[in-house]
Amino acid sequence: MNAVQVKILNPKIGTDANFPMPTRATDGSAGIDLRACIDEPITIKAGETKLIGTGMAIYIADPNYAGIILPRSGLGHKHGIVLGNLVGLIDADYQGELMVSVWNRSDTDFVLNPAERMAQYMVVPVVRPSFQVVEEFNELSARGAGGFGHSGRQ
């Protein structure tokens, strides 16, 4: 897969210098930046979550791929701005506007400005295994059923 369909829902995108077409920030960037498609700044209070539109829809079509929306590391580390659902999974057959659940996990209000890069979008391959119901696994792994800290912290 080399292309997905992008539907521009807000006429500012690609025509207003503040709302460029979605692109990667650098040649080495894995994802494209998703910008806040808002008309005026929005204050996200400490602990609050807001759903913010991107002004576009992306249709992948190929069920062997999915889109994921991830937080931007700088916003998360410096300002406590992450995704309310931690990771957004966008199915290949979804055709609606990409929305970003923006969560301010800090104790300080945050102002999100129009066209500000708030998240990133990646297309990833999807593996669809069949499931085989068994009474017991055919081999024991070294880990077994140990979980939630089973392997220690060091």
Curated annotation (Swiss-Prot):
Q: Which family does it belong to?
A: Belongs to the dUTPase family.
Q: In which pathway does it act?
A: Pyrimidine metabolism; dUMP biosynthesis; dUMP from dCTP (dUTP route): step 2/2
- Enumerate the catalysed reactions: dUTP + H2O = dUMP + diphosphate + H(+)
Molecular function GO terms recorded: dUTP diphosphatase activity; magnesium ion binding
Q: GO biological process: what's one of them?
A: dUTP catabolic process
Protein name, as recorded: Deoxyuridine 5'-triphosphate nucleotidohydrolase
Q: Where do the coiled-coil regions begin and end?
A: none
Q: Which domain of life is it from?
A: Bacteria
Q: What does this protein do?
A: This enzyme is involved in nucleotide metabolism: it produces dUMP, the immediate precursor of thymidine nucleotides and it decreases the intracellular concentration of dUTP so that uracil cannot be incorporated into DNA.
| Gene name for this UniProt entry | dut
Segments spanning the bilayer are none
Give the UniProt keywords, A-Z.
Hydrolase, Magnesium, Metal-binding, Nucleotide metabolism
Cofactor (UniProt) = Mg(2+)
